[in-house]
Curated annotation (Swiss-Prot):
Compartment annotation: Mitochondrion inner membrane
Name of this chain's protein: Cytochrome c oxidase subunit 3
GO cellular component: mitochondrial inner membrane; respiratory chain complex IV
Keyword Transmembrane helix: yes
Coiled coil: none
Family matches, as InterPro entries: Cyt_c/ubiquinol_Oxase_su3, Cyt_c_oxase_su3_dom, Cyt_c_oxidase-like_su3, Cyt_c_oxidase_su3-like_sf, Cyt_c_oxidase_su3_a-hlx
Keywords, comma-separated and alphabetical: Membrane, Mitochondrion, Mitochondrion inner membrane, Translocase, Transmembrane, Transmembrane helix
Positions on the Mitochondrial intermembrane side per record topology: 35-40, 106-128, 184-190, 257-261
Segments traversing the membrane: 16-34, 41-66, 73-105, 129-152, 156-183, 191-223, 233-256
Free-text function comment from the UniProt entry: Component of the cytochrome c oxidase, the last enzyme in the mitochondrial electron transport chain which drives oxidative phosphorylation. The respiratory chain contains 3 multisubunit complexes succinate dehydrogenase (complex II, CII), ubiquinol-cytochrome c oxidoreductase (cytochrome b-c1 complex, complex III, CIII) and cytochrome c oxidase (complex IV, CIV), that cooperate to transfer electrons derived from NADH and succinate to molecular oxygen, creating an electrochemical gradient over the inner membrane that drives transmembrane transport and the ATP synthase.
Positions in the Mitochondrial matrix compartment: 1-15, 67-72, 153-155, 224-232
Gene source species: Canis lupus (Gray wolf)
Principal EC category: translocase
Amino acid sequence: MTHQTHAYHMVNPSPWPLTGALSALLMTSGLIMWFHYNSMSLLTLGFTTNLLTMYQWWRDVIREGTFQGHHTPIVQKGLRYGMVLFIVSEVFFFAGFFWAFYHSSLAPTPELGGCWPPTGIIPLNPLEVPLLNTSVLLASGVSITWAHHSLMEGNRKHMLQALFITISLGVYFTLLQASEYYETSFTISDGVYGSTFFMATGFHGLHVIIGSTFLIVCFLRQLYYHFTSNHHFGFEAAAWYWHFVDVVWLFLYVSIYWWGS
């Protein structure tokens, strides 16, 4: 590394890919044990090792990029391409759920009663909690943009305030979604409506939790002065992800809650 004559980051050997793979094996095996034998010990072990791996791996990435200066402009360009491709893969992930929903709803089979929602299903009112959830996520999209512009202008105080508001709105959305699930009259096992509804909105809720975690890490990093107006890709990637989550929810609201009800 001392005689490096190029701008690329030659990554040092790391144990985290191996521990990450092992934790994934433990989690998938643990899920099977939980489903079939009602034992959560293997799942808990896998989840714990996965969390530890993520923490230590991203800790190393922060050290390399923030303190050791390995994230040169050309490395950041590669990271940007990687984040864009990751979000594109997520788009296709959710496209599968929308495909399943529209495939079932546009031509409901006789088993469903020939109508949508299927006979016996009482859908949620789209003008109640779902509309509030939409307002909350749209407001969080505004506040994350405010945080980004504040960071670009070097206004640390406003950046922290806007980021805190965004995190609070994300947590509020998650609580609203949980309360909505608690009040539904149908379950994930209630045919194709229940399965598509809970899979699509559930995975979106998981993405909101992941995005909120990203933003909390960015908030803590900003407290320690990790970001500058021209070197803040970690925050930028989290903001892109949050906007993606925001847009997916709009499609979910229009498709499943409003049109689908």
